[in-house]
Amino acid sequence: MKHSDNLRSVRSEYADADGSRCVYLTFDDGPNPLCTPPDI
């Protein structure tokens, strides 16, 4: 399955009757390792 196929299925599940989306999904990969101090 491609990434765009994933988004298409999410859109169809959360679309209103007229096709507009009312739910916004965000994806967080966690903190940026370059900006996060190392554990000591």
From Swiss-Prot:
It is found in: Cytoplasm. GO terms for molecular function: hydrolase activity, acting on carbon-nitrogen (but not peptide) bonds. Residues 21-40 form the NodB homology domain. Keywords: Cytoplasm, Hydrolase, Nodulation. Its EC number is 3.5.1.-. One of its GO terms (cellular component) is cytoplasm. The active site is at D28. GO terms for biological process: carbohydrate metabolic process. Its main location: cytoplasm. It is an enzyme of class 3 (hydrolase). Belongs to the polysaccharide deacetylase family. Is involved in generating a small heat-stable compound (Nod), an acylated oligomer of N-acetylglucosamine, that stimulates mitosis in various plant protoplasts. This is Chitooligosaccharide deacetylase. It comes from Bradyrhizobium sp. (strain NC92). The lineage of its organism: Bacteria, Pseudomonadati, Pseudomonadota, Alphaproteobacteria, Hyphomicrobiales.
